[in-house]
Design a protein with these regions (language model features):
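Catalytic-site neighborhood detector that most strongly recognizes the C-terminal catalytic loop/helix
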Residues: 129, 190-194, 227, 275-300
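C-terminal catalytic core of Y-nucleophile DNA break-rejoin enzymes
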Residues: 191-210, 215-236
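Short, basic (Lys/Arg/His-rich) helix/loop patches that form interaction surfaces
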Residues: 145, 215-220, 224, 232-273
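C-terminal secondary-structure termini that scaffold catalytic or DNA-interacting sites
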Residues: 301-317
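Conserved tyrosine-mediated DNA breakage-rejoining catalytic core shared by Y-recombinases
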Residues: 125-128, 134, 170-208
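N-terminal DNA-binding recognition helix of tyrosine site-specific recombinases/integrases
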Residues: 37, 45-55, 81-115, 166
């Protein structure tokens, strides 16, 4: 039994071996149906699992048949303590690990389900975003250098298109298309999920594209720099503009979801599609309805009760 647990029995496939086979398959699908980001997450999960097995059992691998509910909870504890992973990061790693267990069960390697009583829940994160007034401050502020002007333009472009950094960086003129309605759209694929992203261009992103048209090398349509430098320069812009929020490029995506679209009455189904989300629950995490939107909605509702208010006034006043 000890040899089986330690993965020494030839009749029992080991967990890290199966995990590696799975990751090799994912690697071959990168650029087809998987992204490099997904592959890397599986690789990191496997590495943490290998370190846990080595630390807990002093072996290099164990039999899949010995994976128990206790093993699952011990691995979670290891991620939270030894690896110092946050709640949601730990939950993501456990989701990737569960995928391997599902494969083992589907292939008859494992009969029971060690995850049966284990619930993976993600904490809701209050995503930051810029208000319309803060966007206006950034737009109006004179930038002290061309470098910061470029960064400001990229950030504002994302605030009005919702594109993530990697997708902005990959844009070419081929992605700017005249659609069925005669308007210009961005038509691309979201690299993270390989889903279609089609976004009608508002006037501000159109003006930004026009500003750089024919002025950049290598067929670029925007002055893209590395994400690391971009975020460093955004902190400079935040200081210049007196904005206290943590200004990152991804904040522009949250701003698009909240301030640019949902708060202006764009249906969440439409926003979800433009963001390239595969399910609407993801959009609900990103998007927060602002107080101004709540106020304007309730004002509109108030007008619909004018008749009832008159009745009450006649009776009670």
């Amino acid at each position: 039994m000890k040899n089986e647990f330690l993965g020494h029995s030839e009749s029992h496939e080991t967990i890290l071996t199966l995990f590696q086979k799975h990751n090799d398959d994912v690697k071959q699908l990168v650029g087809i149906s998987k992204t490099i980001a997904t592959y890397r997450k599986y690789e990191v999960t496997r590495r943490h699992l290998a370190e846990f097995i080595r630390s807990k059992y002093n072996v290099s691998d164990i039999s899949i048949k010995e994976i128990s509910p206790m093993f699952i909870t011990d691995f979670e504890l290891y991620l939270r303590t030894a690896c110092k992973c946050g709640y949601n990061t730990t939950a993501k790693f456990m989701q990737f690990f569960k995928r391997i267990i599902i494969i083992a069960r589907n292939n008859g390697i494992l009969v029971g389900d060690p995850f049966a009583s284990y619930k993976i829940r993600l904490e809701k994160v209050d995503r930051g975003y810029l208000t319309e007034d803060e966007i206006k401050i950034i737009l109006k502020k004179k930038m002290v250098s061309e470098r910061l002007e470029h960064v400001r333009d990229l950030f504002i472009f994302a605030c009005f298109t919702g594109l993530a950094y990697i997708d902005v960086a990959g844009l070419t003129q081929d992605n700017i298309c005249k659609s069925f309605d005669g308007n210009l759209w961005i038509m691309t694929k979201r690299q993270k999920t390989n889903t279609d992203v089609n976004v009608p261009l508002l006037d501000i992103p159109k003006m930004i594209l026009k500003k750089y048209k024919g002025k950049l090398p290598d067929g670029k349509i925007l002055p893209v720099i590395s994400n690391q430098k971009l975020n460093a320069y955004l902190k400079e812009i935040a200081d210049i503009c007196g904005i206290k929020k943590n200004l990152t490029f991804h904040l522009a995506r949250h701003t698009f979801a909240t301030t640019t679209t949902l708060s202006k009455g764009v249906p969440i189904e439409t926003v979800s599609k433009m963001l390239g989300h595969t399910n609407i629950e993801t959009t609900q995490i990103y998007a927060r309805i602002t107080n101004s939107k709540i106020g304007s909605d309730m004002q509109g509702l108030d007008k619909k009760f004018v008749g009832i208010e008159k009745i009450y006034k006649e009776v009670a006043m």
